[in-house]
């Protein structure tokens, strides 16, 4: 997917009359240029997938990357960097820094060489990064409050099954895991009993 996307990274031109009030004899030109150094901060729950989804587009766009894997995923991050190296990515294009976020986090997100930050993690840390960084573009995927919504006409057996699967699959360590259930009062007690039966 990332390699295919790379084939379409080209400039564009937009006729001036595409915008109200602009003249036909003018055009807008869009060029795509590398940002420079992308800091990719990956979470623990999908240490390869989410790191690769940050690294690949950055490289395809001509940037170099500093990968900061989660402490619990440091070995995965180091091995992933090795895979890119063995695939022919030149030395220095992907760099990996490991350590606890509380020890090195503030330093790396405020480093003067970082031109863009791509972070996946908690809302709390995302807010901290946002406060610490000044004029550095940010792309963040932060923790959610994912809800299952159950209405009065729902199939309660199916709803209970999906709630349990949504909450407990992958040990609940997914950003999209069900974290709360919003259910109408008329079926709440029955739903609770069905969920309890599935998890006991």
Can you say where each PLM-predicted feature lies in the sequence?
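Beta-loop-alpha module in the N-terminal Rossmann-like domain of NAD(P)-dependent dehydrogenases
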Residues: 38, 45, 102-107, 121-128, ...
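Short coil/turn connectors at secondary-structure junctions
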Residues: 26, 32-37, 61-63, 90-92, ...
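General beta-strand structural signal in soluble alpha/beta enzymes
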Residues: 67, 96-98, 119-121, 138-142
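N-terminal Rossmann NAD(P)-binding subdomain characteristic of aldehyde/semialdehyde dehydrogenases
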Residues: 1-51, 55, 89, 94
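PLP-dependent aminotransferase-like
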Residues: 51-105
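ALDH superfamily catalytic-core signature
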Residues: 116, 124-200
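Periplasmic-binding protein-like
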Residues: 56, 115-120
């Amino acid at each position: 997917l990332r390699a295919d996307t790379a084939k379409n990274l080209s400039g564009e031109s937009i006729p001036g009359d595409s915008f109200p009030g602009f003249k036909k004899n003018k055009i807008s030109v869009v060029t795509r240029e590398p940002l420079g150094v992308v800091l990719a901060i990956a979470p623990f729950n999908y240490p390869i997938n989410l790191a690769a989804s940050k690294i690949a587009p950055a490289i395809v766009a001509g940037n170099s990357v500093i990968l900061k894997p989660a402490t619990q995923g440091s070995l995965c991050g180091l091995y992933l960097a090795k895979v890119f190296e063995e695939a022919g990515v030149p030395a220095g294009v992907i760099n990996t820094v490991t350590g606890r976020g509380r020890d090195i986090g503030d330093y790396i997100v405020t480093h003067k060489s970082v031109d863009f930050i791509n972070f996946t993690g908690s809302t709390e840390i995302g807010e901290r990064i946002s406060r610490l960084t000044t004029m550095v573009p940010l792309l963040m995927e932060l923790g959610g409050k994912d809800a299952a919504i159950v209405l009065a006409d729902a199939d309660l057996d199916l709803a209970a099954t999906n709630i349990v699967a949504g909450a407990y699959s992958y040990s609940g360590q997914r950003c999209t895991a069900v974290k709360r259930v919003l259910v109408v009062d008329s079926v709440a007690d029955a739903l609770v009993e069905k969920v309890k039966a599935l998890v006991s």
